Amino acid sequence: MEAYEQVQKGPLKLKGVAELGVTKRKKKKKDKDKAKMLEAMGTSKKNEEEKRRCLDKRTPAQAAFEKMQEKRQMERILKKASKTHKQRVEDFNRHLDTLTEHYDIPKVSWTK
């Protein structure tokens, strides 16, 4: 038990470091931050509008092409949304009925 009598009890201390107390951090005032944020949001909206005007360097043909692409995509979406799933399944079954039976597997007979 004599070996355990030499154990240091208490907090560890670092050599060469003066004892410094725990310092509390200063709290930031939120009112000033909120005011700055509101100002920044107002200016950022204005900047975004200006950037949009400056960044639109597409040719008229490119703008027309993208406009037509969006229009066609909307038409496709409306066309798909107009039918219910049940109607689509019925149309698909009608289409399969009209196909030739070329791809059907012929009957396999063991006798012939």
From Swiss-Prot:
UniProt GO cellular component terms: nucleolus
Main localization, broad class: nucleus
Compartments in which it is found: Nucleus
Keywords for the protein's UniProt record, in alphabetical order: Apoptosis, Cell cycle, Nucleus
Name under which the protein is recorded: Protein FAM32A
Recorded family membership: Belongs to the FAM32 family.
Gene name tied to this protein: Fam32a
Function noted in UniProt: May induce G2 arrest and apoptosis. May also increase cell sensitivity to apoptotic stimuli.
Native species: Rattus norvegicus
GO biological process per UniProt: apoptotic process
Region (Disordered): 23-56
Keyword Cell cycle included in the entry's annotation: yes
Any Pfam family: FAM32A
Disulfide bridge positions per record: none
Coiled coil: none
Ranges of biased composition (kind: Basic and acidic residues): 45-56
Annotated signal sequence range: none
